[in-house]
């Protein structure tokens, strides 16, 4: 939870059980479930972690994960935008589709510095989270 100015070298304790993570303010990180191989799990439950401090955007790209159908346009994207002043994350309308794409999914939205995790049921249309 410490804040550091950029452009410096930091010596940090990093035992094998704890790896330090440094993330630029105004970043959006998406995390899927732990899997052993790409198509083991349908990624219908995704964590979205917002590191506030500046406005941010991220394009969540998804495809079947096990073939080249993305070259034929079989993929989807979901835009994510963080408005730092309003403290609002907008999960935009999904574009595109692919075989086996989950039509509904759960996003667990965590804004760093706020202990609350917001569970959002997303069905492809724009939704805002504060």
Can you say where each PLM-predicted feature lies in the sequence?
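Intrinsically disordered, low-complexity linkers and stems that provide flexible hinges
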Residues: 116-130
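Catalytic core of carbohydrate-active enzymes
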Residues: 1-115, 124
